[in-house]
Amino acid sequence: MTQLPTNPMPATPLLDKVDYPDDLKKIDDRDLPQLAAELRAEMVDAVSRTGGHLGAGLGVVELTIAIHKIFDTPHDRLIFDVGHQCYPHKILTGRRDRIRTLRQEDGLSGFTRRAESEYDPFGAAHSSTSISAGLGMAVAAELDGKSRNVIAVIGDGAMSAGMAFEALNNAGALDARLIVILNDNDMSIAPPTGAMSAYLARLASGRTYMGIREVGKKLTAYLGKTVDRAITRAVEHARGYVTGGTLFEEMGFYHIGPIDGHSFDHLLPVLRNVRDNAKGPVLIHVVTQKGKGYPPAEAAADKYHGVNKFDVITGAQAKAKPNAPAYTSVFADALTQEASLDDKIVAITAAMPSGTGLDKFASVHPSRCFDVGIAEQHAVTFAAGLAAEGYKPFAALYSTFLQRAYDQVVHDVAIQGLPVRFPIDRAGFVGADGPTHAGSFDTTYLATLPGFVVMAAADEAELKHMVRTAAAYDEGPISFRYPRGEGVGVELPERGEILAIGKGRIVKQGNKVALLSFGTRLADCLLAAEDLDAAGLSTTVADARFAKPLDHDLIRQLARHHEVLITIEEGAVGGFASHVLQFLAEEGLIDGGLKVRPMVMPDIWMEQAKPEAMYARAGLDRAGIVSTVFKALGQKHGVGLGAAG
């Protein structure tokens, strides 16, 4: 690991006076720029020590301060979409003393969480949920007869997802008291600046123009929708500038902006006006700069979205020397290689080109790589359309995000038997991002679908084989899963082999205990086998490769010639083990006394930690496997056995 210097803590005399949002209300507006600078320094220092999402939070410092100063949180509900931008919010809401535990074991979450603070009314991590949740809270307040503001802060990327527009449409129809702040940090033009634009923003959010809109609504009741549109356009012109807000106005929102999200002269009066005057749904378009105030992040916003620990002075990130190539990199290289040999191969990502490795693919095959944005549902059906026309689409998604498109997987892909390939990254525990990003369920929900081939790579060489196997398979949908992080260091073939569908492999032969692994727990199985052999328990280790179709011959062999059969997987109950147990029961292979023990993720939400610590806590490591075997045999765990020995 690169050694970083220990930088001194930043001086923050004004921030030191702020423990909770009520303290902000005591600070003069003229001192807020200093507070913003100190808050940025505190955030940069904290993330430099823990790693995390830096750029998004730096971009909303002024906005976060302004919201908490103007509104009455937690009585007023403040919801952050995704949550990458919530670090300044956490510092201002009683969690500054723990901010240097971000994303660490037993530390603060990197996202908003209801269980963590009353200032987090709704948890987040996946995108585009804030407006729906906020609308629910706004309607609940109306039903309860309570006067309460609900503010949803959503980025321009998250706004591209269909769920956000579904919520906007419903909010406009209900005319609910909801404030949506569109944080636009990817605008191609500079935000409006200067006294005139600040004046116009105040004017547009004030009582006069909001009153014009109310008159327009009443006229519409008598004169129809056409007149309403004309009034909307007239109001836009009366504001004195073209806002681009016509779409939101058509959906029933009062639109304000764009305004400079780094100017308190813009933010404070607009938020005050909206708080005091607005009725119905309001959308405030705020333009910000990702990474604002920290030069390395401003210069390379993409590289400072999510960061490792880094040196505050230089911005240099700590990087461990790799022992083996990362699974994501192996996948990307293998797919790029296959695409060079087959011009029907295309790749699809949902706003994660770097995370899935498809940026590598795109650099070689730019016309055959499609980033569809934060739109997993569309990504899957788009892939289905390509498959229907004879192409070989690889829809590369994280396991946790594939959940968002399950109906499309079932209805548009599986029922039609279309050969869409699903490379599933971030399988199993992912570490610092915690339960919201764990790849726990894909085997369970895919292997239940008729005609679906479900694979898991045991190591990086197996991953190359599975990429080629998927490219060659045209009989229906096929998936292969692999984890975050480095491989185990096996030798990589020049090109992957085409695997026989539904066939596993024996890696080590024994005769008393059988360990049947699905996925990268294979390495721990081999280590556990060393301990078991040393204890006189001859152990077979097998790599299933496939959860569907199962290798029936392999399972019969293991069941008939061993006293104990353990299945191990990096997934929830209902996955690989359930299919194995179903087969064993149907075949009568457990009637003769075979001791079968499934090892799966525990039925809890596993909190953030390093992945190896999470697997140990789950009992899915070397020591856990050895312990499970001894318990199955009714024996005490031998002294010195397992990883903990």
Swiss-Prot record:
A single Gene Ontology MF term assigned here is: magnesium ion binding
Listed under subunit, the entry gives: Homodimer.
Could you tell me which NCBIfam families the record lists for this protein? dxs (TIGR00204), PRK05444.2-2 (NF003933)
Q: Which reaction does it catalyse?
A: D-glyceraldehyde 3-phosphate + pyruvate + H(+) = 1-deoxy-D-xylulose 5-phosphate + CO2
* Name of the molecule in the record: 1-deoxy-D-xylulose-5-phosphate synthase
Alphabetized SUPFAM superfamilies for the sequence: Thiamin diphosphate-binding fold (THDP-binding), TK C-terminal domain-like
Do you know which Pfam families this protein is assigned to? DXP_synthase_N (PF13292), Transket_pyr (PF02779), Transketolase_C (PF02780)
Which positions carry the signal peptide feature in this UniProt record?
none
What is the stated purpose of this protein?
A: Catalyzes the acyloin condensation reaction between C atoms 2 and 3 of pyruvate and glyceraldehyde 3-phosphate to yield 1-deoxy-D-xylulose-5-phosphate (DXP).
Q: Which PROSITE patterns did the record assign? A: TRANSKETOLASE_1, TRANSKETOLASE_2
User: What keywords appear on the UniProt entry?
Assistant: Isoprene biosynthesis, Magnesium, Metal-binding, Thiamine biosynthesis, Thiamine pyrophosphate, Transferase
Q: Which cofactor does it need?
A: Mg(2+); thiamine diphosphate
UniProt source species? Rhizobium meliloti (strain 1021) (Ensifer meliloti)
What Gene3D superfamilies would the database entry show? 3.40.50.920, 3.40.50.970
* Note on cofactor: Binds 1 Mg(2+) ion per subunit. Binds 1 thiamine pyrophosphate per subunit.
- Biological process annotations from GO: 1-deoxy-D-xylulose 5-phosphate biosynthetic process; glyceraldehyde-3-phosphate metabolic process; terpenoid biosynthetic process; thiamine biosynthetic process
Q: Which CDD domains match?
A: TPP_DXS, TPP_PYR_DXS_TK_like
Indicate the enzyme's highest-level EC class.
transferase
